[in-house]
């Protein structure tokens, strides 16, 4: 047996989440079924979990398979055949037997995409349509998140985290064409953390929440915002080992 790392992307609007779901509507379910068509029945392990409607341009999974799969490019081609059209396998690599796809991760990155153009139903599942805002101010507010923080008030219930401490390496906003993008990089994320963070920054920009309240929530003093930004604008964009 050998262990392989699968790098892939997926359209989150087609799934109930990335993890195994009832009625097999999770990304993990579809990818596991595709592997079974190729005679690979070992448990598929995922590096990250995303909620319903959240996308991934760069996700990672691992699985054990027979040593006879020596042509990984052929395996990639066949796996794409069975996971099409909402999952795309970008690369398959052989890894060491002790590789831990989840616990060996050094950092994860997410991007949240806003569109400031006219509403289009064809884009509605992939961006958050939102009026233009002060990008400089957004950058300033996002900067409050950088560093080692106890983000217990930026966490949905139901997570399996042993601690709510996280180190945020990057939290910034930038423009690309008619889009504004929030970029987050950290050693790990809590369930719902980014969507709660995005919604909190937007509330300050809208004047519905003060900077002081945002800082108090980041400093784990009190929760001032309970609302989450919609999932459709969020993308898992990088996982580093």
From Swiss-Prot:
- Where is substrate annotated to bind? 110
GO BP term, pick one: tRNA pseudouridine synthesis
The keyword Isomerase belongs to this UniProt entry's keyword annotation:
yes
Which InterPro entries does the UniProt entry name for this protein? PsdUridine_synth_cat_dom_sf, PsdUridine_synth_TruA, PsdUridine_synth_TruA_a/b_dom, PsdUridine_synth_TruA_C, TruA/RsuA/RluB/E/F_N
Residues the record marks as active site: 51 (nucleophile)
Q: List the disulfide bonds.
A: none
EC nos: 5.4.99.12
The protein's matches in Pfam families, at most eight in alphabetical order, are given as: PseudoU_synth_1
Q: Which residues cross the membrane?
A: none
The GO terms this record gives for MF are: RNA binding; tRNA pseudouridine(38-40) synthase activity
Gene3D superfamilies assigned to the protein according to its UniProt record, in alphabetical order: Pseudouridine synthase I, catalytic domain, C-terminal subdomain, Pseudouridine synthase I, catalytic domain, N-terminal subdomain
Q: Which reaction does it catalyse?
A: uridine(38/39/40) in tRNA = pseudouridine(38/39/40) in tRNA
> Keywords assigned by UniProt?
Isomerase, tRNA processing
Q: What class of enzyme is it?
A: isomerase
Asked whether the UniProt record includes tRNA processing among its keywords, one would answer: yes
PANTHER family named in the record? PSEUDOURIDYLATE SYNTHASE, TRNA PSEUDOURIDINE SYNTHASE-LIKE 1
Q: Which family does it belong to?
A: Belongs to the tRNA pseudouridine synthase TruA family.
Q: How does it assemble?
A: Homodimer.
Q: What does this protein do?
A: Formation of pseudouridine at positions 38, 39 and 40 in the anticodon stem and loop of transfer RNAs.
Q: What is this protein called?
A: tRNA pseudouridine synthase A
């Amino acid at each position: 047996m050998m262990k392989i790392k699968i790098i892939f992307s997926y359209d989150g609007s087609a799934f109930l989440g990335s993890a195994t779901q009832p009625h097999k509507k999770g990304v993990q379910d579809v990818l596991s079924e595709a592997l079974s068509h190729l005679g690979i029945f070992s448990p598929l392990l995922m590096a990250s979990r995303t909620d319903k409607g959240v996308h991934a341009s760069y996700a990672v999974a691992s699985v054990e398979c027979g040593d006879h799969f020596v042509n990984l490019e052929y395996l990639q081609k066949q796996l794409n055949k069975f996971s099409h059209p909402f999952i795309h396998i970008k690369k398959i690599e052989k890894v060491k037997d002790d590789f831990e796809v989840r616990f060996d991760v050094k950092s994860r990155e997410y991007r949240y995409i806003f569109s400031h153009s006219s509403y289009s139903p064809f884009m509605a599942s992939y961006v958050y349509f939102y009026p233009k805002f002060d990008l400089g101010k957004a950058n300033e507010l996002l900067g409050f998140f950088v560093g080692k923080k106890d983000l217990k008030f930026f966490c949905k219930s139901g997570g399996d985290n042993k601690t709510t401490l996280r180190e945020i390496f990057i939290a910034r906003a930038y423009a690309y064409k008619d889009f504004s993008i929030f970029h987050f990089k950290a050693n790990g994320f809590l369930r719902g953390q980014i969507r709660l963070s995005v919604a909190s920054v937007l509330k300050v920009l809208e004047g519905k929440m003060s900077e002081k309240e945002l800082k108090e929530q980041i400093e784990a003093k009190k929760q001032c915002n309970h609302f989450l930004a919609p999932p459709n604008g969020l993308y898992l964009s990088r996982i580093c080992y």
